[in-house]
Amino acid sequence: MTKLHFVRHGKTEWNNQGRYQGANGDSPLLPESFEQIKALADYLRGISFAHAYVSPLKRARVTAQTLIKDLNEPIPLTIMPALREFNLGKMEGMTFTDVAKHFPQELHAFRHEPTAYDPRKIHGESFPQLINRAIPAIVATVAMDRTGTANLLYVSHGAALAAVIQSLLGTPLAEIRKDGGLTNSSVTILQADGPSLPFKLLNWNETSFLPEPPKPTDTI
């Protein structure tokens, strides 16, 4: 079976400030994130990864590069544009408080009712648009595993990964928040018997290896 390891990037300055950070916003990783990534590497040590794929956004690229360095393994790394975060439009860079004030309907739907989320007012990206760009790219990487036993690594973003992983599992759009969100520097593991969906969940949002228990705001 092919195993897919999905990692959310390390905690950033905007995460710490409570700002929305999508496909058009980026901020540096916090110093503490590098300790968390090292702990993640220790957790994953012993797994031989055939390939790693990463979002083009810098916070994800730095996470992936640091993780591979800490693993001390020559893992090929490919930038995959399909793994970028949601385009959050006008919400990019805004604080959680300001978004709740100016775009309450959009925020509620984005967080709690994905089927009702209409991002046209904020010039953002819908759940179907995100899923339709990401799923084919990920499935294609599984199809390239001729051995059928490879370990693959994907480094991406919280909101995007939560939606995409649930879609890979066959979860209806209305239920994609049923397992909650994903924490900075967490890993979620799926298993695939070839590229046909749905895949199988082995571990959701694993964080037991982190040096300190995550805060509620570290999960999205």
Task: Give residue ranges: language-model regions.
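Acidic, low-complexity terminal tails and accessory targeting/binding regions
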Residues: T2, E73, L88-D98, A143-A150, ...
